[in-house]
Amino acid sequence: MCEDRLKTPDSNGNWGNWHSCLKHLEVYCDEATTFDDIDAEWIQGFKDYLNTAEKDAQKKTDPKVSYVFVGLSQNSKVSYFNKLRACLNQAFEEHIIDKNPMRGIEGFKAEEVAREYLTLEEVKKMAATPCNYPILKATFLFSCLTGLRKSDIEKLTWGEIQKFGKFTRIVFKQKKTGGQEYLDISDQAAAYLGTRRNDVDRVFEGFTYGAWTSLELKRWALAAGITKNLTFHCARHTFAVMMLDLGADIYTVSKLLGHRELSTTQIYAKVLDKNKQAAVNLIPSISE
């Protein structure tokens, strides 16, 4: 059933999670395991396995190579356990099993992850600093100004770019969620699009993101005097925090980011809580 989910995942971005979950299940149990074998004890065993599992489930031990054990992150455990839960729930709903062994079993609790982002001044520094790969600079700054994910930037075509008077709008389907989005962008962001070509042409032709571009992003940031551990996705976080910091209301920011739930956007409001920042300065000086 997990393999079936891999063929038709609910989102393209979720495929990797299903694939990783399947690999860990293959390590935990043998091919002869059936639904009849899965009970509360088996599920608890899988939880215990995830607590001790290595990040790379396919890693082979080579006596000539020294390995450093890297366990699963808390949120990876949450994701993989929930994948198993989804499979068992589906099996129960489709009457493949008479009882759902997952009922009443508590999963892992998600861990809140700090979001790295750039301040407006840092974005200005990045913009003013040369980058060895102009396409990387253009796409990263475009993401800082629009909040678009790199996966959507990679596939963006000119047919998705529309002009409405003075405004530029991107009409596209999110790769991660499949949701239809209507994103108005600023003139400043539109300037990074370049010269319009055929509708089927990619806007940022030649842009792909991998290990070398990740390294180059860090080099570019260091050249700008920024030592934060940047990834391309930090640009999306940067957009969200900048919008809230500049006074945009959270509902509008949520729509611009294409979030399905407002609670997802509220994480950024928590990062930038000016009320708390002001409150801590209310205490008078305690120095004589």
Model-flagged regions — what are they?
Residues 141, 145, 151-152, 236-260, ...:
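C-terminal catalytic core of tyrosine-transesterase DNA break-rejoin enzymes
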Residues 104-107, 116, 120, 155-193:
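Conserved tyrosine-mediated DNA breakage-rejoining catalytic core shared by Y-recombinases
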Residues 174-178, 257, 261-282:
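Catalytic-site neighborhood detector that most strongly recognizes the C-terminal catalytic loop/helix
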Residues 1-68:
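Basic/aromatic-enriched alpha-helical hairpins
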Residues 38, 79, 210, 227-247:
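Short basic/aromatic active-site micro-motif
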Residues 175-219:
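C-terminal catalytic core of Y-nucleophile DNA break-rejoin enzymes
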Residues 56-61, 69-74, 78-82, 93-97, ...:
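Basic, Lys/Arg- and aromatic-enriched nucleic-acid-binding interface segment
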Residues 125, 181-187, 191, 195-196, ...:
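DNA/chromatin major-groove-contacting recognition/catalytic segments
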